[in-house]
Amino acid sequence: MDDDFRLEELALHHKRELFRCASRSIEEYLRTLARKQDRNDSTRVHVYANGHGRIAGYFTLSAATLELRDLPEEIQRGRPKFPLPATLLGRFGVDREFENRGLGSLLLGLALVNAYAASKLVASAAIVLTIANDASERASALYRKYGFLPLPSNTNRMILMMSVVRENLDREDRLE
C-alpha cells in the first residue's frame, strides 16, 4: 500500500465516483448518501485515501443500541435489563484495485481503534455490524477472525464486545 494513503474524514476532494467494490450497495452508499449522512450527523464516514483524493477503502461509525434479548446469552448474563449502548460499524468497503493487500484487515483495525477511543468519551459496550446481503463470505470470515459473534436473532448481524477490543489493544501495547 502506498505510504501516501491515510485515514481521513470524508471531504469534498475525495473522489467517491471512482470507488468500485464487490458490494454494489456499499459502492452506491459512498457515492450517493455518505456525504449527506455525514453532514447531518447520522454517521461518520472515514476514508482511507491518498493526497489526490483516491479512496482505497472506507467505513462508517455511528451510535446504536441493542436490545438485550437479541444478544447471545453469554453477553446477556449479569447485565441490567436495559438496551446496550453500542457503536455501529455501518458500512465497510475496499476498492477492487486494493483487494488482497491486507487493506480490509487494516481498515477493520482502524475502525475498532476509533470505536474504542470514542467509547472512552461516550459509553459503548460493543461494536455491531450488519453484513450486506451482497457481501462476500470473505467479509464474514474477516469479522469472525477479529472475534465478532453472530447475533442469534439475525445471523447477518455480528457483535464484538468493547472489552475484547480493549484486551486486544492492551495485549498489543504489552508486545511493543
Where are these regions (language model features)?
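Non-catalytic substrate-recognition and accessory regions of acyl/acetyltransferase enzymes
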Residues: 1-101, 105-140, 144-176
